[in-house]
Structure formats: C-alpha cells, structure tokens
Amino acid sequence: MKTNMLTNNCKDKIFIKKSHTILRLLYFFKSLAMILFFIFFSLTSYAKPKIVVSITPISSILAMLVKDKVDIESLAVNNECPHHHNIKPSDITKVRNADMVIYINEQFDGFTEKLISNNNQNIIKISDIKSLTTIKNNWHIWLDLNNAKILLQEFAQIFIKNFPQLQKEINNNLPIALKELNKLQDIKNNEFRTIKDIILLSDSSEYFFLNTNIKTAKLYRESQKSLRYISKLEELIKGSNNKCIVLSNKQKSQLYTKLNAKTKIIILNSENWNVKNINSNTFQDQYLQMINQVKKCIH
C-alpha cells in the first residue's frame, strides 16, 4: 500500500512538473509572438515610402518637402532631354518596388508611361494639376518658381493623404520650402535687374524667364544650320541691347562662335539635372547655378 502511495505521489509530482513546463513553454511562445508582432509592426510603421520620379528636378522639389523621410529615386539622371531617355532594367525594378510614381505626361517623359502600364501603384501625373502655369507643348514647368511652389503645395496634399504618418513632417517643411523659393525669386530678380533682353534658342529655357522684366526673343528651329536661320539670328542680335543668346545644354555652341564678336553665348542647364544623390538643398543649388549662368549676359 505504501508502495502505491509513493508511486501515485511521484506521478503527481511528475504531472505537476510537466504542467509547469508546458505553462512555461506557452508563456515563452506567447512572449515570442508578441515580440515578433511588435518588431513587424515597428518595421512596417516606420518603413520609408518608396517614391519613383521620372526626372531629377521634380525629385528635388519633392525632397524639399519630405527631406529624408521618404526614399526618392529618379529614373532619368542626366542633363539630357527626358524625351530621349532609354529605359533600363533598373528602371523596371524601381517602378515595380515603388509605393508611388510621379511623372509629367506622355508628351514629355513618356518613357514612364511604358513602365507604369502594368503596375498598380499610386500614379501622380503632374500635367493633371490645373493650377500650374503652362506653355503649349512645353513642360519644363519647374523652371518657373511659381510652378515650383504649386508643386510643393500639391505634393503636400497628396502625401498627407497617402502617407498620413508624414503629416507632421510635411506641415513643418512646407512653409520653410516656400520661403526658400521666395528667396530664390528675390535673388533672381536682383541679379537680372540690369539685363534688358535675351534671345532664346530653346523652348526649354522659356519658363526660367517668366515673371522677370527681361524681354525675350524666341528663335526655335529644328534645324539651326540654315543660312536663313543664321541670318534671322544675326538680325535679332543686332537689335539687342545685351546681345546674349541662351542655348540648352543639348545644343551645340560651336554653331554660333562665328557670330558678332560681342555676342555672349549662355548654355543653360534647362533640360534635366545630372544629380544622383538628391537632397533637400538640390533644387536651390541647381537653380542658383542657372542664375549664375545667365548673369554672364551682363558682362
């Protein structure tokens, strides 16, 4: 009888031990599950949105608004006209992994439309923003600082709606960014105050001279080598005060070296910007470079 009692007692102790072990294991797995849940929640909550933008000037305006809270990648990273961008395999990967894609329209950066045709991301088409000042068949809109301000304000609304976790950051950055653009406008007006007129040979520069007191003559031609074209250009230079012609960086300045010796040839970086690491100062830096390029018309 004593033996049976001892046996039962041992069984009870073993059962209790097993129960405690099971409870400990359950508690361990419950704690582990909670830890993994919080890690996953933290990673998903604080993961930066991935935004793909067709060209660097638009990327740089966006960076003023979101700074380092968003991963921004540009597709066309060069000084060339976006019309001629050749799609690369890396572009396809960028778009596929993006939370949002921003481009201008099929006419300007149409390569982006090909990339987004089979994707379901949020697509922002800038030409749909009706408050922008636009020139027919010309979409270098960022060179007009008033347009840059409109883009900042439109992007602010879009990003707060799609990424509400960025609202505080955007609300803090927007007024600062608008002030920076106002400063650029003041610098531009001050530096250009003695420039009376210029001659534009590329429509890509046209937006840059909106809202200034500079009179602009425009001579846009596909072929810039004909005698008629050169004759017309010489006539415009003769009647000009500053005798300053403005080309885009895709045009060949060598064609104009035999013009009037007093003619100043300005090559303006107006097509796109070859900047790989976009940050919140990129737009101001690039725009100031363009102001300094045009200042050569004075001397």
UniProtKB/Swiss-Prot annotation:
Membrane topology: Single-pass membrane protein
Gene3D superfamilies assigned: Nitrogenase molybdenum iron protein domain
Principal location listed in the UniProt entry: membrane
Intrachain disulfide bonds: none
UniProt subcellular location: Membrane
InterPro entries: Bact_metal-bind_prot9 (IPR050492), ZnuA-like (IPR006127)
Protein name: Uncharacterized protein RP014
Species in which this protein is naturally found: Rickettsia prowazekii (strain Madrid E)
